[in-house]
Amino acid sequence: YRKYHAPMGRLVYIGSAPKGAEKSAELAMNGMKAICGALKVGGKAGDAYAAWREVAASAGLADYERHHCGYMVGIGFSPSWTGGSMVTSLFPGSERTLEQGMVFHAHSWFTDTDVVDYFISNTVILTKDGAEVLTATTPENLVVK
């Protein structure tokens, strides 16, 4: 809308979901909750990644890593907010201080593991009270059949 972006993503299976998809969906949802729980005013961007990694490790995926679990979004002009070194990401060890009003595309993404692939993402805004999901469909509404 007027160059503002609020991305959201869900992995959708066509037909029947593979065996284990429900467990993978729960893992991804727990990862999203951990990311949102770690986004706090005055905190560090790397804290969100660490919280997501802890969920992965607790599920037996101690060696599973991604380059980040979210990135800042908002108004976008070419080239875009989807890449480049100027984009603030929720990456391992990031010392970027989080501020009220920052908006992130947070994602909990598990692919190419010994569990079934699953992915969810939401746009969240950092408020004085923590992360608030802005996208209309929350992870709790997912149904795996």
Residue ranges with predicted function:
Residues 1-145:
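Active-site neighborhoods and metal-handling regions in enzymes and metal-associated proteins
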